[in-house]
Amino acid sequence: MKRLMTLLAAAFMVLAVNAQELANFQRVNVVSPEIKDGQVTFRLKADYATVVELYGSWMPGYGDRIPMTRGENFVWEVTVPAPSPEIYTYNFYVDGVSVNDPTNVLVQRDGNRYLSMLLVDGERSENYKEANKRGSVSHVWYDSELLGINRRMTVYTPYGYETSKKTKYPVLYLLHGGGGDEEAWSSMGRAAQILDNLIEKGLAKPMIVVMPNGNPGQQAAQTLNLPVSDVNFRDPANANAYVKSLVTEIIPFVEKNYRAIPKKEARAIAGLSMGGGHTTSATMLFPGVFDYICPMSCGLRDGENVDAQMQAIKKAGYKLYWIGCGTADFAWPGTETMVEILKRNGLEHTLYASDGGHTWYNWRLYLNTFAPLLFK
């Protein structure tokens, strides 16, 4: 009897598993997004929805949405012309509620938002894809006495770093903008993919890329849910605390723990928006540290000490002062002021004026453009 019950139980389990497999087999196979013949089709299975819409970052305004049509098995669908080659983000609105594409595993985090990703292949986006020879990306913790907390940064090491035990590398300190953190450049910016491709093609020198958290009160990205510092960094007494920490704590940490070349000619600094401000501040406060200076989408205030600080940069010497900004960017007037200050003080520089505004569309392009110019 006991054996019979055991056999019946086993048979029941087999039937249950088969039933589950059948249920899985009968589920609707939704493919989204699907790029074909110059068009992109987006699909979402939403059984009880009455209105489903699509919003994509390639659309002109945040209020613009494209209605989707309900088809068989409650799969909503819309086909649109493929935007120009680039990386875009998108999401659906189901009865007014924003949701990501559940069938798309490619996701980017922008601050406190997760967004589905669309990569349209082409010349501009070629270096945003995975390379054949890939470097490593790691999260590294360090102690900051200046900021009073243990903090995290993201570090990229190029392909071959682990095996070339004696080779030393130059370092790019790559800074994010407001609302970002130490993961912004590796997620939204595709920094690792861009460097991997440029290095593999021989267009850029193999380099270490350090991406710190530019929010002085944060230990790390908010995804870790760690408490923030209670120090008021808006207090003038704490002015430039993060920039000072970058130069006096992060750089020594990197040069001690990585095979980094500890010389001015092997250090570059670049940043977007808030990070662009950190870039100019770091080079004006510490003019003898970096040979390559690349602020993006930011401005520079003209004040009584600016000329003296610019003259100090000129005296210390540098190899590249590269500025990138979109002509439709709200930071463009500030960029024009920066250029005027550099001209007034006789500092050679390059202005890369692109179209577009204050977006990753431009910042990825800028990294892809200036990285080959570093450490030459």
Predicted regions and their residues:
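Short, solvent-exposed loop/edge segments of extracellular or virion-exposed proteins
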Residues: 25-27
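Hydrophobic h-region of N-terminal signal peptides that target proteins for export
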Residues: 10-18
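Sec-dependent signal peptide recognition
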Residues: 2-8
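A periodicity- and composition-biased signal for non-globular, repetitive helical segments
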Residues: 8-9, 157
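Non-catalytic cap/lid and distal C-terminal segments of serine-dependent acyl enzymes
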Residues: 21-22, 32-65, 69-376
